[in-house]
Amino acid sequence: MQQRFTPRTGRRIAAGIAGAAAAALMLTACSGDTGSVDVADEAPDELSGTVSLWHFFTDREASVIQGVVDDFEAQNPGVTVEVHEGQDDEKLRKVIAAGSDDIDVGLSYSTDVVGNLCSTGAFRDLQPYIDRDEVDMSQISDTVQSYSEFEGTRCTMPVLADVNALFYNKDIFAEAGITEPPKTLDELEDIALKLTEYNDDGSIKRLGFNPFMGMYENTAAHFGPAVGGKWLDDDGYSAIGSDEGWPVLMQWQKDFVDEIGYDKLQAFTAGLGQEFSADNAFHTGQLAMTIDGEYRTAFIADQAPDLNYGTAPFPTATGFEDLYGAGYIVGNIAGIAKGSKNPELAWALLKYLSTDTDALVKMGNGLKNVPTTTAALESPDLEVSEQYQTFIDIALHPKTATTPPSLVGAGYTQAFGSYWEKFQAGTGGNLAEGLAGVDQEINDSVDLVSGP
């Protein structure tokens, strides 16, 4: 199966923290303006001309985007949209940094680039267009708004989102007499241990839940809402080491790993099928519970249609019960490239993709990602199964969290994730000292990009 470029896979193929800093420096060096442009007092009565759209989708998913583009052209007969599919973020940034005018609208799979694109002017400031056209930004949640702007500059608009939740196998639950999914991390561990089975040689046959950091969607970002983990302070520096929640979450996860055995978990995890294949361990019953995104519902429908499963918000830690029902959200973002030859037409297309209810619902149904406006989330035309409803509810929850844009892109999440994997292996040393080291690594990288 072809790898899908999304917020989840984008982070997997991204470079390390040094690479993120280097990319930011490259874009900064090649972008000298702020992205501010003169905007006409009124939007044109009639749209005409040619506008280019660069996006990362391929194959079936690209056809979904094309269908929405066709609708836009049908509503605006004088407009031609030149679509360039399969364009990843690295190419997008390089083309913009080179000063090319080939890109009008760029659609990215990751919010990791927002800090760079906004701060360097690689994407234009959209606020003048938003103000002029009186776009109702209140239809987009504060959290989603936060990951599509940087330090007061809105250079992107959100276009669909990924939301994470707990998946659980109803048949395995029923066999064990379990009637409800866990709501706390302690309940999650208790149920998981009850559902875990071993082979005669002591190796793991089935896991109730795999706590192993780095397995499938097991990341700090996805686990973080269980304690309301804070990433950055108001100045863009690391808040990880000073946050009260992260040590609680990390110690719970480490103790869970130790309860089963690091070596056993490592061996079991290494033998699991690929995440985006039919052999995904939740599909096969090797995992009774797992954390995953709304897109998993589409994979199950296609690859394991007989699987009897449910979804629920991911559990929260003791003392953080008020966060239950929330979760993690991140998504695709789109903006107008600084070299756009037709920014007015580019804005019209961007506004359509990011705020038109019919367009968002059509993309949501076709891609099985979560729409990013309240109107689209509540539209009767949105195809919502019982399992999918969980993700809608999480997206609408006021305490749902995200990873904020940064000058170092994904660098800060990668630095933390790297240390966490050492900690779970027992090689991370003292936790407080380790987190202080993570803070220092992140802050040094922010200073490197920020300059004197």
Model regions: which residues?
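Conserved C-terminal helix/tail region of periplasmic/extracytoplasmic solute-binding proteins
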Residues: Q3, A174-E175, L396-P452
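Hinge/lid segment of periplasmic solute-binding proteins
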Residues: Y109-V163, K205, G224
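Long, aromatic- and glycine/proline-rich binding clefts that accommodate carbohydrate-like moieties
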Residues: G364-G411
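Extracytoplasmic/periplasmic substrate-recognition and gating elements
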Residues: A176, D258-E259, D263, A301-K368
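Conserved N-terminal structural module of periplasmic/extracytoplasmic solute-binding proteins
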Residues: Q2-G115, E134-M137, L272, T318-F320, ...
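Short helix-initiation/N-cap motifs at beta->coil->alpha
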Residues: E85-K94, D112, L185-D190, Q266-H283
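Glycine-centered hinge/linker elements that transmit conformational signals in sensory
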Residues: A192-L193, Y237-A270
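Extracytoplasmic/periplasmic solute-binding protein
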Residues: E151-V159, N164, E189-I240, G245
